[in-house]
Amino acid sequence: MKYFFALLITLFFTMPAWAVDVSMGSGGNLVFEPDEITISAGETVHFINEALPPHNIIVEARPDLSREALLFAPGETQDVVFADAGDYEFFCGPHQGAGMTGVIHVQ
């Protein structure tokens, strides 16, 4: 029993941080869904390309968080870890003018 408890404690502290999924181009629309989320510092946002055309993630205030490589195929993903608290506006480079924008609130 002592070893089982130790194993549970170890697993609890080694579990990865939660990830929040954000769809890109869902339903063929030029949108992020959801386009506004709130997460805790250290959490991962998992961006998923749901449809053509290509998309990317630009965080203008923090270029180090941007994922400028284009995701061409449905199902391609990019992960971004937000370590610092703040509000992060982001957009898809090719589709910003069409309104493909969002904001991530990190607490």
Each model region followed by its residue ranges:
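Positively charged n-region of N-terminal signal peptides that target proteins for export
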Residues: 1-4
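Cleavable N-terminal signal peptides
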Residues: 6-7, 17
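Extracytoplasmic copper-binding redox domains, predominantly the cupredoxin/blue-copper superfamily
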Residues: 17-107
